[in-house]
A protein has these predicted regions:
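Short helix-loop "hinge" at the ATP-lid/N-box region of the Bergerat-fold HATPase_c
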Residues: 47-52
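Glycine-rich/acidic phosphate-handling loop/turn and adjacent ATP-lid/helix
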Residues: 73-101
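A conserved short beta-strand within the histidine kinase catalytic ATPase domain
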Residues: 58-65
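Glycine-rich phosphate-binding loop
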Residues: 98-113
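Conserved short strand/loop->alpha-helix "switch" segment adjacent to the catalytic nucleotide/phosphoryl-transfer site
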Residues: 19-41, 98-100
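Flexible, glycine-/charge-rich segments associated with ATP-binding catalytic modules
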Residues: 1-3, 7-9, 110-138
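Short beta-strand-loop-beta element adjacent to the nucleotide/active-site pocket used for signaling
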Residues: 65-73
C-alpha cells in the first residue's frame, strides 16, 4: 500500500487510519500493529514539524507491506537531510525535569521496532522500519 501525504499535521489522522486498515486487512497481530502505530505517529510528526527549515511544502510517501514474516513501513520525504537514528539516546536515569527536550520518541521507535534504517537517496530521506509478526500472521 502506498500513500502520499503533505507535510501538514492534519495528514496524521488519515495516515494512522490507513495503517489501521492495512493492519486489519492483513490480520496483523495487536503487538505489531500498536508498535507500528507508535513509530509511524512519531516519525510522521517529526517530519511534518521539522522537515523543512523554511516551513515550505514537501511531500511524504508512506509504503506498507508484509514481507518475509514482517511488517515493513517505508517513509520518504523531500525535507532536509536528517537521520533520526543518529540522535543520542535520552538519559533515562535523570529525573524528567532535568532531561533535555526531544529524543524520547525516537528512543521508543528504536525499542518497539525490530529493525530501523535510514538513507538519503535521490534527494529524499528514506526511513525503513520492520516489525516481526506473530507466527500466526500472514
Amino acid at each position: 500500500m502506498r500513500i502520499e501525504l503533505d507535510n501538514n499535521i492534519t495528514e496524521l489522522a488519515p495516515a494512522m487510519a490507513a495503517l489501521q486498515a492495512f493492519s486489519a486487512s492483513h490480520a496483523l497481530d495487536e503487538a505489531a500493529s500498536q508498535a507500528a502505530e507508535l513509530a509511524l505517529d512519531e516519525l510522521l510528526s517529526n517530519i511534518i514539524r521539522h522537515g523543512r527549515l523554511d516551513a515550505g511544502q514537501h511531500d511524504i510517501v508512506m509504503e506498507l507491506a508484509v514481507e518475509e514474516g514482517s511488517l515493513r513501513i517505508r517513509i520518504s520525504d523531500g525535507g532536509i537531510p536528517f537521520n533520526p537514528f543518529d540522535c543520542p539516546p535520552p538519559d533515562l536515569d535523570l529525573p524528567l525535569e532535568e532531561r533535555e527536550p526531544g529524543g524520547q520518541g525516537i528512543h521508543l521507535v528504536k525499542n518497539f521496532m525490530d529493525e530501523y534504517d535510514y538513507e538519503y537517496r535521490d534527494r529524499r530521506n528514506v526511513v525503513t522500519l520492520r516489525k516481526k509478526l506473530a507466527s500466526n500472521a500472514p
